[in-house]
């Protein structure tokens, strides 16, 4: 069976600062949207947002949720993968990746929607969920090319290619949550594959480590205000030689830094 503690608290480390703060912020924004109905309109990404130069929505749309269940499901789904990513890449680095992944997925959504003459708007962090789950599955596939379904469903002996697990998750989500945005989820998944397989390309878009370290130095007074029990992962604390560690129990480490570096550390 999957080990939730591996994802929620990798190697026993405390909850990550950005992940924890993001969950609080998502809840806060949802609360405001319940008080002011028009508030959510400033976040919802429509197919015309890109072409109307309404660029703020390209990065803001994952922050707004349209219902309580929408918020709860996305919060539960994002906390594990994002906490895992942040603890192995650094807090500021993860913030940059969150923004970049939202923008790239948003552009994909707007362009494809325009080509298909779609007019439906999207909002919510589910695109991020697919991005980070896909990234983890790509890395997991380097340890185990096939995923045994018995880890999730006792008695089932079938297996599927690990790197294609997000596709199965995408189809499952489309069936169970039939009102969700299939295109939005697909765009998020595509970004996850880009991150997993195209790290060299993605590195170009991420500030080098020395810039992130400078930002951390300037933000040090604020970092020190983070409550006890929640950790801000500094770039200098990230060991790029550790490689990827499986979130399944009792599995060994496979270095993922040969050749090159951990995503965004070049």
Curated annotation (Swiss-Prot):
Residue ranges annotated as transmembrane are 16-36, 60-80, 92-112, 118-138, 164-184, 192-212
Q: What is its EC number?
A: 3.4.21.105
Q: Could you provide one GO biological process annotation from this protein's UniProt record?
A: proteolysis
**Compartment list:** Golgi apparatus membrane; Golgi apparatus, cis-Golgi network membrane
How is this protein annotated for GO cellular component?
A: Golgi membrane; nuclear periphery
Which residues does the Swiss-Prot or TrEMBL record annotate as the active site? 126, 185
Q: Does the keyword Membrane apply?
A: yes
Endpoints of the signal sequence: none
Keyword list, A-Z: Golgi apparatus, Hydrolase, Membrane, Protease, Serine protease, Transmembrane, Transmembrane helix
- Catalytic activity from the UniProt record: Cleaves type-1 transmembrane domains using a catalytic dyad composed of serine and histidine that are contributed by different transmembrane domains
- Look up keyword Membrane and say if it applies: yes
UniProt-listed InterPro entries = Peptidase_S54_rhomboid_dom, Rhomboid-like_sf
Lipid bilayer topology: Multi-pass membrane protein
Question: Gene3D superfamilies in the record, alphabetically?
Answer: Rhomboid-like (1.20.1540.10)
**Superkingdom classification of source:** Eukaryota
State the Gene Ontology terms under molecular function.
Answer: serine-type endopeptidase activity
Q: Which family does it belong to?
A: Belongs to the peptidase S54 family.
Briefly, what is this protein's role? Probable rhomboid-type serine protease that catalyzes intramembrane proteolysis.
Record's protein name: Rhomboid-type serine protease 2
Say which species the protein is native to.
Candida glabrata (strain ATCC 2001 / BCRC 20586 / JCM 3761 / NBRC 0622 / NRRL Y-65 / CBS 138)
Organism taxonomic ancestry: Eukaryota, Fungi, Dikarya, Ascomycota, Saccharomycotina
């Amino acid at each position: 069976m999957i080990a939730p503690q591996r994802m929620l608290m990798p190697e026993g480390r405390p909850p990550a600062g950005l992940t924890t703060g993001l969950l609080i912020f998502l809840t806060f924004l949802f609360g405001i949207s319940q008080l002011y109905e028009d508030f959510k309109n400033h976040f919802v990404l429509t197919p015309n947002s890109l072409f109307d130069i309404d660029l703020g929505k390209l990065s803001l749309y994952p922050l707004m949720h349209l219902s309580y269940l929408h918020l709860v499901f996305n919060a539960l789904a994002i906390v594990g993968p994002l906490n895992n990513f942040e603890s192995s890449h650094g807090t500021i680095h993860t913030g940059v990746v969150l923004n970049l992944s939202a923008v790239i997925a948003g552009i994909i959504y707007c362009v494809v929607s325009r080509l298909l003459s779609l007019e439906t708007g999207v909002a919510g962090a589910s695109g991020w969920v697919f991005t980070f789950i896909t990234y983890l599955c790509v890395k997991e596939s380097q340890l185990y090319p096939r995923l045994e379904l018995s880890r999730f469903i006792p008695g089932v002996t079938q297996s599927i290619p690990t790197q294609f697990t997000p596709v199965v998750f995408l189809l499952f989500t489309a069936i169970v949550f039939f009102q969700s945005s299939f295109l939005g989820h697909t765009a998020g998944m595509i970004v996850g594959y880009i991150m997993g397989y195209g790290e060299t390309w993605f590195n170009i878009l991420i500030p080098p480590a020395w810039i992130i370290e400078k930002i951390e130095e300037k933000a040090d007074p604020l970092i020190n205000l983070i409550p006890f029990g929640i950790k801000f992962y500094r770039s200098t604390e990230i060991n790029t030689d550790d490689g990827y560690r499986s979130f399944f129990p009792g599995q060994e480490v496979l270095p993922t830094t040969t050749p090159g570096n951990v995503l965004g550390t070049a």
